[in-house]
């Protein structure tokens, strides 16, 4: 069953820039965390588009291209920006395109150039590719399933972006893909994910480590980058 334009409207729909701030302020979503971060740090958010669909088959190329162009047009119209915050999933598949997020990040990078930082928030069920890591400055994944930490992870993205812009943080990101598929229901309050997240937090406490994430993978996507992974961001 392909993901079509109707698939997006069946869930949360496609929100306009004006609707994004008003409808998602104070809501436990990554963008809700972006908004909180903007309020706390005192920077201006310029929303572009939000499009959210239930997981299904590959998205049709015309729908994907239309959504991506609206995102890019919003960035163009924003003028002289200091950075980009993106709420992505991490396992989007398009007709004849296996790495939707890698393509999105590449398109954003081509538009804004190499010196404007891009920080993106990902689902814990991500198939993280090397292209995604190469095109973003920082990727931060959610750490809970059920996913109750969406706003905190969005806030963390905003915090890291502020560190890059105002404090000169120079993030370096590394990805290790694990040849393993974990089931969709790896509850992080139970073993073995509980211990894996605890070890992740231990690594994050080490000097020079900015943040780290574990992706359990999205096992229903038949793509080359299918699989669990760990990605870590350090200072320079």
Residue ranges of model-derived segments:
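Structural signal for hydrophobic packing residues in well-ordered secondary-structure cores
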Residues: 38, 42, 75-79, 112, ...
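Hard-cation-handling environments
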Residues: 184-236
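Gly-rich Lys/Arg/Thr-decorated short loops/hinges at beta-loop-alpha junctions or inter-strand turns
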Residues: 14-16, 47-58, 87-89
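N-terminal amphipathic/basic leader segments beginning at the initiator methionine
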Residues: 1-40
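Active-site catalytic microenvironments in core metabolic enzymes, especially phosphate/sugar-handling
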Residues: 1, 29, 147-150, 175-183, ...
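Internal, active-site/partner-interface "lid" segment
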Residues: 165-194
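Low-complexity, highly charged intrinsically disordered N-terminal segments
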Residues: 31, 35-55, 63, 67-75
């Amino acid at each position: 069953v392909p993901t079509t334009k109707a698939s997006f409207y069946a869930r949360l729909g496609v929100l306009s820039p004006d609707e994004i701030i008003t409808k998602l302020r104070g809501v436990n979503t990554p963008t809700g965390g972006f908004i909180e971060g903007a309020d706390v740090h005192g920077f201006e958010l310029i929303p572009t588009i939000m499009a959210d669909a239930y997981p299904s088959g590959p998205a049709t190329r015309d729908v994907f291209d239309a959504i991506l162009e609206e995102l890019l047009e919003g960035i163009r119209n924003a003028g002289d920006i200091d950075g980009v915050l993106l709420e992505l999933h991490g396992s989007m598949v398009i007709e004849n395109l296996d790495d939707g997020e890698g393509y999105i990040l590449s398109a954003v990078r081509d538009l804004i150039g190499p010196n404007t930082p891009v920080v993106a928030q990902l689902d814990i069920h991500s198939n993280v590719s090397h292209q995604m890591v190469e095109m973003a400055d920082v990727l931060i994944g959610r750490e809970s399933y059920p996913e109750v930490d969406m706003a905190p992870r969005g806030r963390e993205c905003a915090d890291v972006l502020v560190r890059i812009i105002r404090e000169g943080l120079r993030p370096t990101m590394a990805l290790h893909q694990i040849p393993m598929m974990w089931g969709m229901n790896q509850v992080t309050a139970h073993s073995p994910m509980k211990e894996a997240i605890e070890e992740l937090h231990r690594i994050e406490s080490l000097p020079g480590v900015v943040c780290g994430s574990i992706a359990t993978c999205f096992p229903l996507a038949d793509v080359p980058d299918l699989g669990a992974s760990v990605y870590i961001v350090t200072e320079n």
